[in-house]
Amino acid sequence: MAATIIDGKAFAAKVRAQVAEHVTRIKQDHGITPGLAVVLVGEDPASQVYVRSKGKQTVEAGMNSYEHKLDADTSEADLLAVVDKLNKDPNVHGILVQLPLPKHLDEDLIINSIDPAKDVDGFHISNVGLLGTGQKSMVPCTPLGCLMMLREHHGSLSGMNAVVIGRSNIVGKPMAQLLLNDSCTVTIAHSRTKDLPDVVRGADIVVAAVGRPEMVPGDWIKPGATVIDVGINRIDAPEKGEGKTRLVGDCHYDSCAETAGAITPVPGGVGPMTIACLLANTVTSCCRANGLEEPTGLTA
């Protein structure tokens, strides 16, 4: 039996509609417009695409979008000054510094200079610690999007066995913590995990976030399990013509879909949820900053 496809594109549209509804209410009832500031250093083509998309969706949700584009040779002091100015700006409720930064800039230093309350990426060490102790925090966008889709599909996740493949600070570790906070029994697997196929076969939920194209085959998946594929990998596609490529996840989609009960596709699965959750975090931050009731269903 073919797996149910978890349509991240459709679910992200639903989340963005919820965000827009809350933004309208905040404007009408309190005269406040949530604002998201994005800082881009340099001219990395992929980063430019992401920043444009974030700005477009921010405006479509009714929020203010502030873009700060800096030269690739911008000094650390100048970048810190921009972040400090945004920290102090009451019209800015979310701050995102687009990664990666040029090599001469200390990413950890820059990220930890952001006001934790405005850290809508959820990367500040204070937010990492709050999430790790089960307290209110800003939650990283990609893991939050995965959690939302899992909750939508399953309802309660309590008691389920979950395996997260990947231990990055951006996805793997916070994803595991979110699942633990939802009362899953969680295993974090990685490149050194012994008997990885057997570990994965015991999971009701598999989150693949390792960055290796089609690493997880269908025979690793427990029948009926839910597979969340975070990977976005570009591989050669000679069947499309010379020099052509295609996007694949960390899971071999066709074989996993034959065994799984539900699966996210690549593209169109986790990816669209990341920006939707960035908008959700910005609204949440705005509400917290102004002592307003937080919107339900838009955070962990």
UniProtKB/Swiss-Prot annotation:
**Catalysed reactions, semicolon-separated:** (6R)-5,10-methylene-5,6,7,8-tetrahydrofolate + NADP(+) = (6R)-5,10-methenyltetrahydrofolate + NADPH; (6R)-5,10-methenyltetrahydrofolate + H2O = (6R)-10-formyltetrahydrofolate + H(+)
Question: Which cellular component terms (GO) are annotated to the entry?
Answer: cytosol
Q: Which organism is it from?
A: Roseobacter denitrificans (strain ATCC 33942 / OCh 114) (Erythrobacter sp. (strain OCh 114))
Is Glycosyltransferase included in the keywords of this UniProt record?
no
For biological process, the GO terms are: L-histidine biosynthetic process; methionine biosynthetic process; purine nucleotide biosynthetic process; tetrahydrofolate interconversion
Q: Which SUPFAM superfamilies match?
A: Aminoacid dehydrogenase-like, N-terminal domain, NAD(P)-binding Rossmann-fold domains
The record describes the protein's role as: Catalyzes the oxidation of 5,10-methylenetetrahydrofolate to 5,10-methenyltetrahydrofolate and then the hydrolysis of 5,10-methenyltetrahydrofolate to 10-formyltetrahydrofolate.
The record's keywords, sorted A to Z, are: Amino-acid biosynthesis, Histidine biosynthesis, Hydrolase, Methionine biosynthesis, Multifunctional enzyme, NADP, One-carbon metabolism, Oxidoreductase, Purine biosynthesis
E.C. code: 1.5.1.5, 3.5.4.9
- Known partners and oligomeric status: Homodimer.
- Gene Ontology molecular function terms on file: methenyltetrahydrofolate cyclohydrolase activity; methylenetetrahydrofolate dehydrogenase (NADP+) activity
Residue positions annotated to bind NADP(+) are: 166-168, 191, 232
What family is this protein classified in? Belongs to the tetrahydrofolate dehydrogenase/cyclohydrolase family.
The protein's name is Bifunctional protein FolD 2
InterPro entries referenced in this protein's UniProt entry, alphabetically: Aminoacid_DH-like_N_sf, NAD(P)-bd_dom_sf, THF_DH/CycHdrlase, THF_DH/CycHdrlase_cat_dom, THF_DH/CycHdrlase_CS, THF_DH/CycHdrlase_NAD-bd_dom
Keyword Oxidoreductase carried by entry: yes
Q: Which Pfam families match?
A: THF_DHG_CYH, THF_DHG_CYH_C
Q: What pathway, per the record?
A: One-carbon metabolism; tetrahydrofolate interconversion
